[in-house]
Swiss-Prot record:
Bias-annotated ranges (Acidic residues): 698-708
GO cellular component: cytosol; P-body
Domain SAM: 611-672
Ranges of compositional bias, category Polar residues: 11-25, 277-286, 334-344, 456-469
Localization, UniProt: Cytoplasm, Cytosol; Cytoplasm, P-body
GO MF entries: mRNA binding; nucleotide binding
Subunit structure: Monomer. Binds to RNA.
Gene responsible for this protein: VTS1
Pfam families noted in UniProt: SAM_2, Vts1
Name of the protein in question: RNA-binding protein VTS1
Annotated family: Belongs to the VTS1 family.
Gene3D superfamilies: Transcription Factor, Ets-1 (1.10.150.50)
Biased segments, Gly residues type: 586-596
SUPFAM superfamilies: SAM/Pointed domain
Length: 728
């Protein structure tokens, strides 16, 4: 409680000292009013006041003590206008006769006692078992309610609360709100709490504004001021200086960082006019890039009554253009390009990749960097060279357009006649390919090996319009095909691999789909031909009488021969034919993976064992004839080996090659296991005789285009070689 009373104002300057009360310390207590201590109220007479003043002057050497300043500061006792007590040291509400401070403090203590008693009663009630059960039932009922029902129930219960309960609820709700950092930050009241201070300090360190500071209620300190919005709130040096006035380094650092981000920004949204108004809610101007006009910045003051709203500022004439067109590089860095091509409306290229003839104007916004201009010029030059303004896949692709006309053989006239893609005038072809192959002037054989044909590629024989743009091959690329032994003793010959790698370096920029498909087929056929030649070379090393494949020259890459490589057709396992005579070991090399091919050395093929013969589907699968499995589901292998050509045809084997393969296999099985057919004079009578072999070979050659092509190319050599094989 207060120990000083309410003082009256002096009546006149002459009796100023009379109307002041002194401290009762060291003197007898003076009580004028039983309800107020040291009060000069109605019960005090003028005579008593005079005695009090005289007693104070005699006891303290004419110095009066003021209770407002602690009773220790001496004041001059002489009367005069200059010796009056200043009004700032006098307590307010001088004309009241009561003591509001003491009464308020008394009520406060009484309320505290009431609150303590209430809390004790609440604690005692919480320990009551009956009350606990009832409260748990109420809580269970409250949990099943919806949010609206809970709010309505709480509101109805609060209507019946007393003033003490209301104050208690207010205090509890405030404590609950302060425990939540979001509520503490957004709440307009109690914005000076510890959590709010920490959040505001964090925002100030980041250079952002505090929403709680903008929502703070009006107080005597800031009633006449208005929180002004900074036009560049994000990373603004002004905001940093406002939160830390003494730290100028942070402001300069933020200013430099903001300038750097603005210079390198490519896709951030800009600001429109009227976006930086002062909002009472969330601050939408915290990511603004452009400030207002200079006139608007000068007119902004701390007073809210004299500030001009930004919406009335028409000094910026940027309404009709992009909000971020403020520099010479904005068009290059802008996500929206000035061209009409949708492909250039991306962030990756800094220059348009496609030619735009309609684009004109070289204003300040179209100024390019030197490097960008150089890149654009190089792209345009490449498009003109490539043709029709198409985008090059790789601008660093080397172009080889040199011609090599040296060391061209004079005997190989077949390589220089006709529309041959690999003729001696084509750029980039090794000169060694023109060496005479030993086959005379026949141009079909060489053309079948390397000619792709104008019908497939749509080109002509002009060397300058070569469709493939083949880079120069190594001089040793085809040398392996010209050695006496063929150079293919090792299947993984490095020279052959070099040749295939050189053929893989073709320029495919100007090829359409059909040309690319034909090129892939040609490369596949060449690979098959090379593998076949490698197998034939291995067989020739075992046969002294084998034909030297070195005479083939470059014609070894013929697609006609490639048709025999790796084929597992039934025809490859028939009796000696024109093809087998023409190419010794070809049947053995082609049928190495099958069961029907015969060895060129005269050896028999491997006959399946009894376990395989018992499983007819597996046996047919081994013979590559599994398509006829349903035809022999009910047949035994012993019945099958006794069948003839007519019986197989009745079983549904309509293909002549399949029947011949079956008959040959059946004959081998009968020979191995000693089974004889009725009327069989000699082993193998189930197979057609020599005349039938010749007729069948002629039919087979008529069915196969590849065999006919080989017959024409060999030119009778195959017929001459077939006679000793037939005698065998």
């Amino acid at each position: 409680m207060s120990d000083f009373g309410l003082l009256r104002s002096p009546l006149t300057p002459s009796n100023a000292s009379i109307n002041r009360a002194s401290s009762p310390s060291g003197h007898r207590p003076i009580t004028m009013n039983p309800h107020s201590r040291y009060s000069l109220g109605k019960g005090a007479s003028t005579e008593h006041m005079m005695r009090l003043a005289q007693h104070g002057n005699a006891g303290h050497d004419g110095a009066l003590r003021s209770p407002s300043i602690g009773g220790n500061a001496p004041m001059p006792g002489s009367a005069g206008p200059r010796n009056l007590r200043p009004s700032s040291e006098m307590l307010p509400n001088m004309n009241h006769h009561g003591t509001p401070e003491s009464e308020a403090i008394d009520r406060w203590f009484e309320d505290l006692q009431h609150y303590e008693a209430t809390l004790e009663e609440m604690a005692a009630a919480s320990l009551d078992q009956n009350f606990k059960e009832e409260l748990s039932a109420i809580e269970q009922w409250f949990r099943v309610l919806s949010e609206a029902e809970r709010t309505a129930a709480l509101y109805s219960l609060l209507q019946e609360s007393t003033q003490v309960q209301i104050r208690f609820f207010i205090t509890v709700l405030q404590q609950m709100a302060r425990s939540d950092p979001v509520s503490a930050l957004l709440s307009p009241s109690h914005h000076n709490s510890t959590m709010a201070d920490q959040m505001e300090a964090k925002l100030a360190s980041l250079g952002l504004k505090s929403p709680s500071a903008l929502k703070s209620p009006a107080s005597p300190g800031n009633r006449g001021y208005r929180q002004s919005s900074d036009a560049a709130g994000f990373l603004s040096p002004n905001v940093a200086a406002m939160y830390s006035p003494g730290n100028t380094d942070a402001a300069s650092t933020l200013a430099a960082q903001r300038a750097k981000l603005k210079a390198n920004r490519t896709s951030a949204p800009g600001t429109l006019i009227g976006e930086s108004r002062n909002y009472s809610g969330g601050q939408l101007d915290q990511v603004q890039e452009r400030g207002g006009s200079p006139n608007l910045q000068q007119q902004r003051t701390l007073s809210g009554d004299h500030s001009r709203p930004k919406s009335t500022d028409f000094s910026n004439n940027n309404v009709g253009r992009s909000p971020r067109a403020s520099g010479p590089l904005d068009d290059q860095l802008s996500p929206i390009s000035a061209t009409g091509n949708w492909s250039s409306m991306v962030n990756t290229p800094l220059v348009p990749m496609f030619t735009d003839n309609d684009k004109a104007g070289t204003g300040e916004a179209n100024v390019n960097l030197d490097t960008a201009a150089a890149q654009l010029a190089s792209l345009q030059q490449q498009q003109q060279v490539g043709g029709n303004g198409r985008v090059m896949v790789d601008p660093d692709v080397p172009r080889f357009r040199r011609k090599s006309n040296q060391n061209i053989g004079g005997g190989g006239s077949s390589y220089g006649q006709g529309p041959n893609l690999y003729d001696h005038t084509s750029p980039g072809v090794s000169p060694n390919i023109g060496v005479p192959s030993g086959w005379g002037q026949s141009d079909n054989f060489g053309r079948g090996g390397l000619n792709t044909g104008l019908s497939a590629f749509g080109g002509n024989n002009d060397s300058n319009s070569n469709q493939f743009n083949i880079p120069p091959m190594s001089p040793n690329a085809l040398a392996g095909l010209q050695s006496p032994s063929g150079g293919l003793a090792n299947p993984l010959n490095m020279q052959v691999m070099n040749m295939m790698a050189a053929m893989g370096g073709l320029n495919l920029n100007n090829m359409n789909g059909a040309q690319l498909l034909a090129m892939q087929q040609q490369l596949l056929q060449n690979q098959q031909a090379l593998s076949m030649l490698a197998q034939q070379q291995q067989l020739q090393q075992q046969q002294p009488h084998g034909r030297n494949l070195g005479n083939f020259g470059g014609g070894g890459l013929s697609p006609g021969l490639a048709g025999q490589a790796g084929r597992k057709s039934p025809r490859s396992g028939t009796s000696p034919s024109v093809r087998a005579a023409a190419l010794p070991g070809a049947a053995g090399g082609a049928g190495s993976g099958g069961a029907g091919a015969s060895n060129a050395a005269g050896g028999e093929e491997e006959v399946a064992d009894l376990s395989t013969l018992e499983d007819v589907p597996a046996w047919l699968r081994q013979l590559r004839l599994h398509k006829y499995t349903p035809n022999f589901e009910t047949s035994h292998w012993k019945e099958m080996v006794m069948m003839g050509d007519k019986q197989l045809e009745d079983k549904g084997v309509a293909a002549l090659g399949a029947r011949r393969k079956m008959l040959k296999t059946f004959e081998l099985v009968r020979k191995k296991y000693g089974i004889r057919m009725d009327g069989e004079d000699r082993p193998g009578s189930g197979v057609p005789d020599g005349n039938n072999d010749k007729a069948a070979d002629v039919d087979d050659a008529g069915d196969s285009n590849e065999a006919q092509e080989v017959d024409r190319e060999l030119g009778g050599a195959a017929t001459a070689a077939s006679a000793p094989v037939a005698k065998d």
